[in-house]
Amino acid sequence: LRDAAMLELLYASGSRISELAALDVESISWSERTLRLWGKGSKERIVPLYRCALEATRTYIEEGRPELIAKAKRRDAENGPHPLFISARGNRMSAAMLRRRFHMLATLAGIPADIAPHAMRHTFATDLLEGGADLRSVQELLGHASLSTTQIYTHLTPDRLKRAVAQAHPRGE
């Protein structure tokens, strides 16, 4: 359950693995369907989440997380913060621990072991652009100060470029 929530949130939010490790249960607004991330330079950003990511995360919080705490023979803090991703020992998982889990899951799925969690961030940005999101919105979602940084994350396919010309150029047919 924890792994499913981790993968869903990585893809749904475009977060860095270090941002994911820093998440608390309180980082999620269920009513607003958003996730509060703290990026580089302690910059805060709020990212909307889709239903599948929320459901996977809720299931983990309600079923998987308490089980991990019980196995570790620990008690959850009364007044928070409540780390979202915890280890079998009941401690907050570090970015390195989450990265190892990611690599293990990739290997189990038959994906080359050299893939990095950061690939999910690239995929997030590319899929948004392919789906019609504007570059400025993607910049905000990724938490980039510079638009040129966001452009590095994008992988425009030849089909996307053809569609852009066909839709936007006066003679593009």
Regions from the language model: what does each represent?
Residues 1-173:
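Conserved catalytic core of the tyrosine transesterase superfamily
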